[in-house]
């Protein structure tokens, strides 16, 4: 998992409340057995004018010019600004995969759905909770200034705007540690690989019958 330390990026404002996971990545794209390739289908039903299906050449599909992520000023955005209860609906880890593979490193909103919130951390996507008043101000700034950027300093736990304003945010110490070091669940386990191998070697000596293959 990629480390998250300090990130500066263009902000894209998604001015909708209760954005659910089916809007983030529609159900037909969940058939894939891979963890990659979801970025082109993030917000598929809002992003394109036709119906999307797995395996399509998305470069040939008609774009919805009214959708915020299709507007030229937000191309290359890596910080998503959203409204309350972002990521609600059914549990699907594909949702943070799609957002991350689109190019987002962080999402700022007044609140998130719990399962989506946890899935973001497990996949290196930083969900930041700010107050509704702070989010309102950032929406106004993002719309008013072309190429509006924010800098997110995870170690300092602060979002910095170009006008000098700072927005502190809370994050659990363990989650912060994992993001700063790029540890997902597998990465955390592999830190103890030597001890795991030692345990398995000792177990094989002490309990050899556990490795006996059953015949018949």
Swiss-Prot record:
GO biological process per UniProt: L-leucine biosynthetic process
Broadest EC class assigned to this enzyme: lyase
CDD domains with a match to the protein in the record: IPMI_Swivel
InterPro entries for this protein: 3-IsopropMal_deHydase_ssu, Aconitase/3IPM_dehydase_swvl, AconitaseA/IPMdHydase_ssu_swvl, IPMI_Swivel, LeuD
GO MF, any single term: 3-isopropylmalate dehydratase activity
Keywords of this entry: Amino-acid biosynthesis, Branched-chain amino acid biosynthesis, Leucine biosynthesis, Lyase
Keyword Metal-binding: no
Pfam family, one: Aconitase_C
Protein function: Catalyzes the isomerization between 2-isopropylmalate and 3-isopropylmalate, via the formation of 2-isopropylmaleate.
Quaternary structure annotation from Swiss-Prot or TrEMBL: Heterodimer of LeuC and LeuD.
Homology family: Belongs to the LeuD family. LeuD type 1 subfamily.
Protein name: 3-isopropylmalate dehydratase small subunit
Species in which this protein is naturally found: Burkholderia orbicola (strain MC0-3)
